[in-house]
Amino acid sequence: MKKNTLLLVIGAVCLAAAAAVYATGASAVQTAREALAALQEDYSKVQAIAYTGFVDLDSEAPVSLDEMLYFPVADSEVGTMADFRALLGRVYTQSKAAEVLDYCTGTTRVLTERDGRLYRADAYEPGWPIGPELEGAKWDGDALTVQVTLEWNEPVPGVVTLRPEGGAWKIDGIAQAA
């Protein structure tokens, strides 16, 4: 009788472990979907301002700085560098937000501020357009690694790392899949 009881206990433990693994996998995908959906509007605005340039610009008030032509950003929500930093902070972790800001103001120099207004160069980069479908997601400690499609001219597999910060899921990394 003890042998049968032991087998039942082992079977129950294995079943519980399998259910936990399945549930974790399912909840990772669901959590990723919900997190990316919550970020979508702000993420799209970051893409427009930081990369593609598909944001309203005031073409009547250009400024030439360091041999580049800039136009004031004509967006009701993002009109200053502080507004843009706040937008980045809603989408990205602190470290990733700093990286994106440095890229925009240093590496590519598409953004600058003058007299308290945010200015953008009239330039285009493809950015990181995340497709609507998730290919999968898995937990990595407290982070989520999400397989997505980056919708460039030719869609390619991508990986987004989401991490909780300040009570919300934020993007901590995004890259083309290896």
Residue ranges of model-derived segments:
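Short beta-strand edge/turn micro-motifs at domain boundaries
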Residues: 145, 155-178
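Generic structural signal for short, solvent-exposed loop/turn connectors between secondary structure elements
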Residues: 22-30, 104-110, 141-142, 150-158, ...
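Core segments of small alpha/beta cavity-forming domains
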Residues: 31-114
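Long, acidic/polar, low-complexity amphipathic helices and coiled-coil-like
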Residues: 2-5, 149, 160
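Surface-exposed, charged secondary-structure patches
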Residues: 109-152
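Low-complexity, intrinsically disordered/propeptide-like segments
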Residues: 9-11, 18, 137, 147, ...
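Gram-positive cell-envelope targeting signals
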Residues: 1-43, 88
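Intrinsically disordered, low-complexity segments enriched in glycine/proline and serine/threonine
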Residues: 5-6, 138, 152-154, 166
